[in-house]
Amino acid sequence: MPEANPFESLQEQLDDAGEFLDVNADVLERLKHPERVLETTLSVEMDDGTIETFKAFRSQFNGDRGPYKGGIRYHPGVTRDEVKALSGWMVYKTAVADIPYGGGKGGIILDPEEYSDSELERITRAFATELRPFIGEDKDVPAPDVNTGQREMNWIKDTYETLEDTTAPGVITGKALENGGSEGRVNATGRSTMFAAREVFDYLDRDLSDATVAVQGYGNAGSVAAKLIADQGADVVAVSDSSGAVHNPDGLDTRAVKAFKTETGSVSGYEGATEELSNEALLTMDVDLLVPAALENAIDEDLAHDVDADVVVEAANGPLTPDADDVLTERGVTVVPDILANAGGVTVSYFEWVQNRQRFQWTEDRVNEELEAIITDAFDAMTDAHEDAGTPNLRTAAYVVAVQRVVDAYEGSGSWP
């Protein structure tokens, strides 16, 4: 079966939401396409003196509610359509969380494992130079994504500020604390995933503390979500990364697994596991809660028939294909969509941006409290829409909320020119 095109998946999700909204078809069509996409070729000198070229993208999908917002990823699988889709999901992620941003996304086609730190710095600074006319504190605010982090964000900030001869810490988020970052940012996506899991179990009149949990993907989002969900009393019985999965029916020590992965580079071989499994086996385990926290399209239509979890909370972006989503809906599996569950990252990025503009630092407790309030309010808005509009699932309900907010902003601004 061919892999689903993520941009087409986004458009299908918007069409699904449109069936429950009184929105002009032309306006909805406008919301299905990016306003602009930058595609550029970076020519960068390698350590050995040779020149290598890299294809890079930045999609600015929609800015009706505020500056474009979204991460930059480094991955050999980056495509133009993927970047467009991810930038679109950011529009609706910021809207469902009701924070004043639009959506953007960027990426470079490369495997960072194949390059030295100095080469990655030159690649990053070359991309930042190309982005310079398009980004800014009130224009487009990038952030980390797959295979990028504080280091890369610091390089982009420094490049922008040097070229612009200014101080603009809010031009980028996800920075190190000493470079204007925010407390709580590193754990934010995993924390919002935990809040979403807690809220959906409460909504279903179930207790998260009694749940068994499997987490696919043990990077930042997955490992933090696993740790915080375990702190709620749940038994995290299986986790995985690209090397495979480890399982213990009595529960894994999530912190010990993270320490083992940090030391060895993978979860495979963790001595606290009773068996090792494939990623596919983890996705079809008999558990109460499944948390996909890896890349897009982890669960397709065929695999969805074998998913044995009662609840799926999407820590990753687009881990279900639309057909898989339909299968899980038909089977009665409750799915909390990515645009709400993993919105912690962009929400705390917003907090970082606010702190940068105020030149004032919040405490971690304040960050976490504000994040919890936004995620719980967003969850309530989603479930209200689900019940009031009669949507088939929570994903469509989340898009109903988000699309309506974007449409209201667009129509309220009038036409120009």
Swiss-Prot record:
GO MF: glutamate dehydrogenase (NAD+) activity; glutamate dehydrogenase (NADP+) activity
Pfam families named in the record: ELFV_dehydrog, ELFV_dehydrog_N
InterPro entries named in the record: Aminoacid_DH-like_N_sf (IPR046346), Glu/Leu/Phe/Val/Trp_DH (IPR006095), Glu/Leu/Phe/Val/Trp_DH_C (IPR006096), Glu/Leu/Phe/Val/Trp_DH_dimer (IPR006097), Glu/Leu/Phe/Val_DH_AS (IPR033524), Glu_DH (IPR014362), NAD(P)-bd_dom_sf (IPR036291), NAD_bind_Glu_DH (IPR033922)
An annotated GO BP: glutamate catabolic process
Superkingdom, taxonomy of origin: Archaea
EC number: 1.4.1.4
Keywords of the record: NADP, Oxidoreductase
Active site: K105
Catalyzed reactions per annotation: L-glutamate + NADP(+) + H2O = 2-oxoglutarate + NH4(+) + NADPH + H(+)
Record has NADP as a keyword: yes
Misc remark: Strain NRC-36014 contains 4 distinct glutamate dehydrogenases while strain NRC-1 contains only 3.
Family: Belongs to the Glu/Leu/Phe/Val dehydrogenases family.
Assembly with partners or alone: Homohexamer.
Designated name of the protein: NADP-specific glutamate dehydrogenase A1
Lineage: Archaea, Methanobacteriati, Methanobacteriota, Stenosarchaea group, Halobacteria
